[in-house]
Amino acid sequence: MTNVIVMLEAEDIARSQRIDARNKAITLLPSAFGARDIEDHYMRMFAFNMEMTQKYGLPADGNWYIDSDTGAVVRDD
């Protein structure tokens, strides 16, 4: 059973979708990105997750993920 913690605001959903799209592209075509681009992407993703943790009061244990399609922050039990 999924446990929705909170729903993101529209602007944060859009940012999450951009990160998710880039993540999928890197996964599918890693050779199209340089090592620096991939590292920068993961640093931006980490910073975004930290920002969302603080903004929405999410658990610091990190056992959650953002469903980019719906904007739901889901507890990953």
What are these regions (language model features)?
Residues 1-57:
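Contiguous, amphipathic alpha-helical segments that mediate oligomerization or scaffolding
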Residues 43-77:
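Amphipathic, charged alpha-helical segments and their helix-to-coil junctions
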